[in-house]
Amino acid sequence: MQKVNDPAVRHTSSGALIRRFLPYLAKYKKTLFIDLFCAAMTTLCDIILPKIMSTITNSAMGVGITLTAGIVLKLAAVYFVLRIIDGAAQYFMSGIGHIMGVHIETDMRRDAFDHLLKLDHTYYNNTKVGTIMGRITNDLFDVTEFAHHCPEEFFIAGIKIIASFLILCQASVPLTLAVFACVPLMGIVSVKLNQRLRARFRQQRIQIGELNATIEDSLLGQGVVKAFAAEDEEREKFAKGNKDFEHIKTLGYYAMAAFNTSTRLFDGLMYLVVILAGGLSLVYGKITAGDLVAYMLYVTTLIATIRRIVEFAEQFQRGMTGIERFAEIMDTPVTIKDAEDAKPLQPGPGGIRFEDVSFEYPDDHNKVLHHVSLDIRAGERLALVGPSGGGKTTLCNLIPRFYEVTGGRILIDGQDIQHVTLKSLREDIGIVQQEVYLFSGSVADNIAYGKPGATREEIVEAARLAGAERFIRALKDGFDTYVGERGVKLSGGQKQRIAIARVFLKNPPILILDEATSALDNESEILVGQSLEKLAHGRTTLTIAHRLTTIKDYDRILVLGAEGIEESGTHDELLARKGVYYRLWNQLPGEDTL
């Protein structure tokens, strides 16, 4: 299924992509200049050999200078020196030139990752992680070869073609014009076939992204797959994606075969012209045997150059595709960013105010929140309840600006959040979610995420406050225990308490609890609930409640529904009204009600 940010929807011209790439190349212009100088040296060596052979052949046949052993030795010495120069130049081109390409690839990947960090939730909701991974890893691998070889190959080709043309014209202008008459036609055919080749490579990149996403889903969801005995369904999904990739790659090789075949046909045509026209010129005395030998060698050099460009075409198109997919990331607009007049959020107790706030998701024009006005006192514990889709999570996500309001404004301690920096805003907000995400690393690393550079003493104290120290010390390596990918080695309750410790370490004045205990067993819920009580003390706390029994003692409860805030009050006040909250409470007291 086509995604919103699928690269198939874009087709950027080669010129535009080259212009996009040039600033990265310009950063290493000194290295590039030396690389091109070395390329010129290797080209000079290749061009001189036919001239040496022409001199020897003509001398042997009595044309020009008399051939002697001394002349042969001098020519051999010249060629030997040139080959030493060629070897040194090739070493630099192969080593330093490739390293330059690696540096450029690294710079581009850094910029792509930095831009991805700035993109909002909407982008990630509409783009598969496997596709994104492919773009910042595989797609940029080919840029290394492209960055090194593209300037080098075209520079060498330009020198050889121009030099060959001038030298061949000295031998025979009519013969040279006949040979070069094939070049424009070859260029036209090559451009057409190259366009088809690039389209195939673009399709391959798209499909490998889809395949990566399928594999990621299956592997990360192994618990669900095994629970439902759905291995056959997963094999079928993978087989389809794998087969689609095979088909697209096959089409790519057909396009490459057509490209290579057309080139070989033109090679043969150019040799045929030389054999016919050159042979007749020799018969009628228009050219010497030595010049014809040199002519054949220069034509061979010319054809070898063209073949090298043809062979580079695949690498060129892969590199262009990588740059194109890189550009697609970089051109994705950053919709949530600091305003020009943004200032750091001034420290305060954490009072929050919603003024006539409305919101709708960018890809859905149905309003989730309608003209919501709400005052949350500093230090107040506020619970949000109501049916799914009522806007509870959305309302909370607007406070740290995970999404932008489409109407009205939100203030924290009297400061409009649209005019404060995102970093300072989010540093003042701690979030504990139902689905805890732990990074691959140690327990200590994950707790320290709340305060980069925290000391071990601070980490341990945060764990103690979260009620996590005892179970952490019981682990094999204590705070240095590896938690596994996404924390798979820990239970749900243990992960929640580490997440709470992370927020304790962050120590923000505002706290958002998004159904933080709803997925836990009773024992874990009690332990985590106690940790959350400690965490919420003295902080402005918004809790999205899944179980009504956990919010009975809150300062205020809001019931959100299709019409916005339908009810507001304490637990006892709302029960006394016998409205929406009363009905929810009496559905299944003490159990999941929403």
Where are each of the predicted segments found?
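Short intracellular "coupling" helices and adjacent cytoplasmic loop segments at the cytosolic face
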Residues: 2-11, 102, 110-140, 213-237, ...
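A short amphipathic helical element positioned immediately N-terminal to and/or at the very start
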Residues: 14-29, 132
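An intracellular "coupling" helix at the cytosolic face of ABC transporter transmembrane type-1 domains
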Residues: 29-30, 121-122, 138-147, 151, ...
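Transmembrane helix-loop-helix hairpins at lipid-water interfaces of multipass membrane proteins
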Residues: 32-92, 169-174, 285-289
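Alpha-helical transmembrane segments of multi-pass membrane proteins
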Residues: 37-38, 82-101, 152-159, 178-204, ...
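Helix-loop-helix
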Residues: 62-64, 68-77, 167-181, 251-324, ...
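ABC-type nucleotide-binding domain
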Residues: 339, 345-594
